[in-house]
Each structure stands twice: as C-alpha cells, then as structure tokens.
Amino acid sequence: MITAMKKYHYSQAPLPFVGQKRMFASEFRKVLKRFSDRTVFVDLFGGSSPISHITKRERPDATVIYNDHDNYRERLENISRTNALLSDLRRLSEGIPRHRMLSKKMHSIFLERIRREESTGFVDYLTISSSLLFSGKYARNIGELEKLNFYNNMRLSDYCCEGYLDGLEVVCCDYRELVDRYRDSPNVVYLIDPPYMATDISTYR
C-alpha cells in the first residue's frame, strides 16, 4: 500500500478547485516530520484534499482524516465523464483561436452538448468552467453557465486522479463535529486551513 501511494504524488489537486493553497507545501512537508508514528491528522477543512494527500504521502504510517464537506469525491468519481465531455468540446472548438471568445452560434452549440450530458447524468461545472470561461469565473449549473460568454480556453489533455485519495479516511461533516469527535483522543493534530477571506466561496457547499 505504501509503495502504491508513493507512486501517485500530486503537487496540486487533480481537478480545479477555488482556493487551492500550494505555496506552503514544501514547508508543510518539513513540519510533518516532527510528529510521532501514532499521530492522527484531521483535515477539518478538506476542500480538494491537497493537505490530506500531502500528509499521507509524507507520513504513510499515520492516520489521515479528510473531511470532504464539498463532496470533491463526486467530481473525482466522474472524471471519465468530464474527460469525455471536454474531448467533445475540444472537437467543437477546432478552428477557433485559443482564448478567443466564441460566437453566439458556437455558444449555443456548446450549451446544447453540455445539456445533453446533464440529461444523462453528472456534469462537473467547475471543471468545465475552467475551459470555457474567463479566468477566475466559475458556474455551478447550466443556468449560470448560459449567461456567461465562452472562450476557447480548452484543456488539451485528460484529467487524471488515479491514487489521489489512496490511504485517506474520508468523512463528510461539519468541522465542529470532527473537533468534538477527536477532542479527547491522544496524538491528534488538527489541520486547519479554512478559505482565505478573499476567496470566492460561492462554489463551496
């Protein structure tokens, strides 16, 4: 199990997530070495789980609890659908210069393909947004998406999440519940990384 986890080492979350914090990763890795083998790390504000992922890769001996309050797992579980949809959108965007705004006609064609995908199941609107919308803008549903201009910012390769959550104990609850659950347990370290005050939290749950 440890060997498999070392094989998949992500420097950032595999799918777009508002508020990822990657700049402190190297210093965080150094701090993790200070704790004992029996330490339980509880990631209270899991987000897209980069902290949980780094912790488990650096400390495979430890227990790591990832609080997936935003249901990031659902997006990971549907990554093959997302890749297939993006592949179709890439084909539709052929001939359109990179970063150029799409015409109203192409806007309608793209929306129709996305609506068809939604009718058969799941659409990861946050990931689709990163390929279609102006930098920093995100839509949470088809209603929000159809009101915005589209740009050809298409990702040129598939997303991959293989092994990303390996070894983590995943829960989904209010962070206060986790604090209470482990309050009196020995060797517990809370990883507290809430969204920055300036972060757009409209995409959070």
Q: Model regions: which residues?
A:
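Flexible, charged surface loops at secondary-structure boundaries
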Residues: 33-37, 57, 120-122, 162-165, ...
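Short, well-ordered alpha-helical microsegments
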Residues: 25, 48-52, 178-180
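Class I S-adenosyl-L-methionine-dependent methyltransferase module
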Residues: 62-165
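A short acidic (Asp/Glu
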Residues: 51-57, 75-79, 182, 199-204
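S-adenosyl-L-methionine
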Residues: 1-40, 50, 131
